[in-house]
Design a protein with these regions (language model features):
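Extracytoplasmic
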Residues: 44-48, 54, 66-69, 129-130
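Non-catalytic cell-wall polysaccharide-engagement segments
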Residues: 14-27, 31, 35, 39-40, ...
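Cell-wall polysaccharide-cleaving catalytic domain and substrate-binding groove, primarily
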Residues: 54-80, 84, 140, 185
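Short secondary-structure boundary/capping segments within folded domains
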Residues: 40-43, 62-63
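Short amphipathic alpha-helical segments enriched in leucine
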Residues: 37, 53-54
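Bacterial N-terminal signal peptides
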Residues: 3-11
């Protein structure tokens, strides 16, 4: 009887979780796993970057916003610049899904390597490091670094993403969008993809 009950529960829970993830993601999963492993190694954060793509475009390669294009929502300027630090992505083409998957994984890895613990405060944990990586992707590395510096100058811990959220040097609307970006990816969407069986482990467990 218990086995039957468990099977029924699974049959109810799995479709609900699957419905929360766009079906189109299955078309890109294998390439995303390959590209993420290429950039991050065997413990690649596939579910995390899948969650980021979900946030960016809902897995729609034709997605377009006023300033960004494609699956990973690169601006034309960033797409043009990216091969300077990620030559392996090839000629910029945000509308091409294969290019976008190469680009988002390489750019995330590049930004992740550049996040440094500031001298004061506790060590930089992986949750904060990824929050800063995602904020840099979304709103620019320079703005983020200035806000971390402002937090440190005020006596806050610049290595704690929650403390840094309180400090702003950009427009209020841009700051709200930027701090909300990693919150949704790390706290809402990544756990959803992990529960659905995408590889990785939670950065903010």
């Amino acid at each position: 009887v218990l086995a039957v009950v468990l099977m029924l529960l699974a049959s109810v829970a799995f479709p609900a979780e699957a419905q929360a993830i766009p079906e189109s993601s299955a078309l890109y999963r294998l390439q995303l796993e390959r590209e993420t492993a290429r950039q991050f190694g065997l413990d690649a954060p596939v579910a995390r970057i899948a969650a980021q793509i979900h946030q960016e475009s809902g897995w729609r390669p034709t997605a377009q916003s006023p300033f960004a294009q494609g699956l990973a929502q690169f601006t034309p300027a960033t797409a043009k610049w990216l091969p300077q630090v990620c030559p392996e992505v090839g000629p910029p083409d945000p509308w091409d899904s294969s290019w976008s998957l190469r680009a988002i994984t390489c750019y995330d890895a590049w930004l992740h390597r550049r996040v440094r613990a500031q001298p004061a405060g506790r060590a930089l944990d992986e949750c904060s490091r990824w929050a800063y990586t995602l904020r840099a992707y979304n709103g620019g590395e320079g703005w983020l670094n200035r806000e971390r510096a402002k937090a440190a100058a005020a006596g806050a811990n610049a290595n704690d993403w929650r403390q840094v959220e309180k400090y702003r040097v950009r427009a209020d609307w841009a700051h709200k969008e930027n701090i909300g970006y990693p919150r949704r990816i790390l706290l809402v969407l990544e756990p959803r993809y992990l529960r659905a069986g995408w590889p990785g482990k939670a950065a903010c467990g």
